[in-house]
């Protein structure tokens, strides 16, 4: 039995190489595994399930094919695709997860998160996040015409890129104290998240015991995934995108 974790693919029409790598990953790595978790920022942008672009339909069909072979697929919102809804998940055969969620990873409780909520030093972003995730805000956004949402997504992306260029790297990384706080709040010793694009396995202490924080990598020059098996230690793996 094997479980795979990925995040931060940022799928978009302008990067067909990443889409192609993902489809190959599904065929070569995900087929036949027990579970596949996608922990946010699966798409570069998502403005509602009603958009239904050729890329989205292609990805949904590919996921459904994997699901139909017996692999359970779980999808968590990221900061760029938090408007993914149940309609897309139904087409893809995926189950939408809350952020955070604790799962049983072969006898070890694991706390799964996208990771943006851990970056508490970026106060401005956390205020923006709280506003955008408010159910009333989400309802208002989805009620607007599709063209308005498409324009808004482009504008927000441009604003985000401009603001991030002026921010210190430390602000955009997780706050160590917040990591410990979440581990202790959920009484677990293992956290898995994405968002920061800084793949690594960190050793720390929480609940008075050793703990680990595993950071998934973004898909750009490399394809990153975490592999967990019943009788093997977790392994953070990567291969050049060009190899897929």
Swiss-Prot record:
EC number(s) recorded for this UniProt protein: 3.6.1.54
Subcellular location: Cell inner membrane
Pathway(s): Glycolipid biosynthesis; lipid IV(A) biosynthesis; lipid IV(A) from (3R)-3-hydroxytetradecanoyl-[acyl-carrier-protein] and UDP-N-acetyl-alpha-D-glucosamine: step 4/6
The protein's required cofactors: Mn(2+)
Cofactor note (record): Binds 2 Mn(2+) ions per subunit in a binuclear metal center.
Signal peptide: none
Cellular component GO terms, alphabetical: cytoplasm; extrinsic component of plasma membrane
Positions annotated to bind Mn(2+) 2: 41, 79, 114, 195
Entry binding sites for Mn(2+) 1: 8, 10, 41, 197
Predominant subcellular localization, coarse grouping: membrane
Keyword annotations from UniProtKB, A to Z: Cell inner membrane, Cell membrane, Hydrolase, Lipid A biosynthesis, Lipid biosynthesis, Lipid metabolism, Manganese, Membrane, Metal-binding
UniProt-annotated binding residues for substrate: 79-80, 122, 160, 164, 167, 195
Family: Belongs to the LpxH family.
Name this polypeptide is given: UDP-2,3-diacylglucosamine hydrolase
Gene source species: Marinobacter nauticus (strain ATCC 700491 / DSM 11845 / VT8)
């Amino acid at each position: 039995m094997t479980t795979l974790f990925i995040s931060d693919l940022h799928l978009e029409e302008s990067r067909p190489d990443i889409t192609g790598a993902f489809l190959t990953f599904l065929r070569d790595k995900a087929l036949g595994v027990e579970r596949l978790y996608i922990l946010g920022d699966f798409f570069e942008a998502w403005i509602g399930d009603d958009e239904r672009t050729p890329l989205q339909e292609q990805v949904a069909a590919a996921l459904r094919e994997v699901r139909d072979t017996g692999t359970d697929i779980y999808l968590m919102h990221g900061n760029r695709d938090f408007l993914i809804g149940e309609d897309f998940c139904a087409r893809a055969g995926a189950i939408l997860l809350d952020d955070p969620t604790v799962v049983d990873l072969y006898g070890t409780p694991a706390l799964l998160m996208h990771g943006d909520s851990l970056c508490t030093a970026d106060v401005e972003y956390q205020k923006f996040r709280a506003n955008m995730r408010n159910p009333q805000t989400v309802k208002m956004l989805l009620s607007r015409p599709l063209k308005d949402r498409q324009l808004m997504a482009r504008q927000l992306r441009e604003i985000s890129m401009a603001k991030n260029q002026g921010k210190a790297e430390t602000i955009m990384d997780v706050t160590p104290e917040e990591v410990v706080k979440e581990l202790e709040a959920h009484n677990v010793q293992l956290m898995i998240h994405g968002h920061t694009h800084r793949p690594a396995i960190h050793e720390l202490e929480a609940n008075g015991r050793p703990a680990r924080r595993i950071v998934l990598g973004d898909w750009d020059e490399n394809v990153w995934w975490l592999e967990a098996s019943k009788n093997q230690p977790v392994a953070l793996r990567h291969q050049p995108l060009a190899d897929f």
